[in-house]
A protein has these predicted regions:
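Acyl-donor (CoA/ACP) binding surface of acyl/acetyltransferases
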Residues: 1-35, 68-165
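Short linear motifs in intrinsically disordered/low-complexity regions
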Residues: 21, 43-44, 52-54, 79
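Conserved GNAT-fold acetyl-CoA-binding loop/helix
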Residues: 32-52
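A short helix-loop-beta-strand connector motif used in the catalytic cores of GNAT acetyltransferases and
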Residues: 53-66
């Protein structure tokens, strides 16, 4: 059974289920969608993504949630809160990934805004963060639409990431 976490005017955010594998694979194994990641995910990586979120739900009560279109129930991405290593510190991050067939429709912003509000209402976070490569202008725009501002850039391996609070 699918556990709905929150709803917006157009979207339903719910916990992932194993049956989301193919929809998730379409997103995170796509070269264009994942061009700001080290590499797209293979089948084993997609399963690890799901398992990581299943584990996050149990351990923390949050994670990335599947995004469905409210009208059709179609899976279009994920958004939510995860703990991420940002400049040497584990911090709560607002993350979002949307199927490229649904880009430029405000889905990432709407889902991330709902996740942000839900997190502040249900957990005692002082702040939420987003981080992305300096080149990832679309993700930066989504973070800014949530009211986030740049606080620093830092070097992490081979990428310079922008941290927005």
């Amino acid at each position: 059974m699918k556990k709905v976490i929150l709803e917006t005017e157009r979207l339903v955010l719910r916990e992932y289920v194993q049956e989301d594998f193919s929809g998730l694979k379409e997103i995170i194994s796509d070269d264009e969608t994942m061009k700001y990641y080290v590499k797209p995910y293979d089948d084993a990586g997609v399963q690890r993504w799901l398992d990581w979120n299943f584990d996050n739900y149990k351990k923390h009560g949050f994670g990335l949630f599947a995004i469905e279109l409210r009208k059709t129930g179609e899976f279009v991405g994920d958004a939510g809160i995860t703990l991420q290593p940002i400049d040497g510190e584990w911090l709560p991050e607002v993350g979002y990934h949307v199927n490229k067939n649904f880009w430029r429709r405000g889905i990432a912003s709407e889902a991330a805004r709902a996740a942000r509000d839900w997190a502040f209402s249900n957990f005692e976070f002082d702040a939420l963060y987003s981080y992305m490569t300096v080149e990832n202008i679309p993700s930066q725009a989504t973070a800014r639409s949530l009211g986030m501002t740049k606080i620093k850039e830092y070097f992490d391996g081979e990428e310079i990431l922008r941290c927005i609070k």
